[in-house]
Amino acid sequence: MPPYQIRWLERPEEFERAAEVLAEVWGMRDLRDTIPGHFMRAIADNGGVVLGAFDERGRMVGVLVGILAMDRETGKIYHYSHMLGILRDLRYSGLGYEMKLFQREELLKQGIDLVMWTFDPLRGPNAKLNFSKLGAVCRRYYENYYGELRDELNVGEVTDRFKVEWWIKSNRVSKRLAGEFPTPPLE
């Protein structure tokens, strides 16, 4: 994988570009369907994480957006990782994994030990990243979680989702990330 710079977004134009990248990744024809740049700025400045990945020419090729969250039942504070998008020409390159590792390091600095997010259980590459590479676990399944979405990746599909937990301080996750917790064969 070529070298990419992963860093926090800082300038208004970077947040606006991040909104465009997310729209491109999901095939959102209407920018109202993505997270607005000004809202990403508010997220980044108030406990959330907004990261960009840049290629050697300075082109933004990936975006990760997450917010500080709290479980309503238990009061547990965690990080909710809402969107991770990589431009199509770099999908499956390992960049998404690198962005999640960067996110983990930043959250550990904040004292966060739990990250949660949803994903479509029928998308195999996402399942491999989340379970096999990152070591996330799933305890919840939601039928039609988002309702009808208009982006190209989800239009006309039911939005069933797994909600995964990534315990970023756990020994199991540390071993998975270090390659000491082998993925069982599918045979």
Descriptions of predicted regions:
Residues M1, R11-E24, V173-E187:
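A short, well-structured alpha-helix characteristic of acyl/acetyltransferase catalytic modules
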Residues Y4-R88, E106, D120, Y142:
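A conserved beta-strand-loop-helix scaffold within acyl/acetyltransferase catalytic domains
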Residues Y92-L107, N126:
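Conserved acetyl-CoA-binding loop-helix of GNAT-fold acetyltransferases
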Residues L107-D120, N130:
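Conserved GNAT acetyl-CoA-binding A-motif
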Residues T118, K128, S132-N154:
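Conserved catalytic-core motifs of GNAT/GCN5-like acyltransferases
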Residues N144-L177:
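C-terminal "cap" of GNAT-fold acetyltransferases
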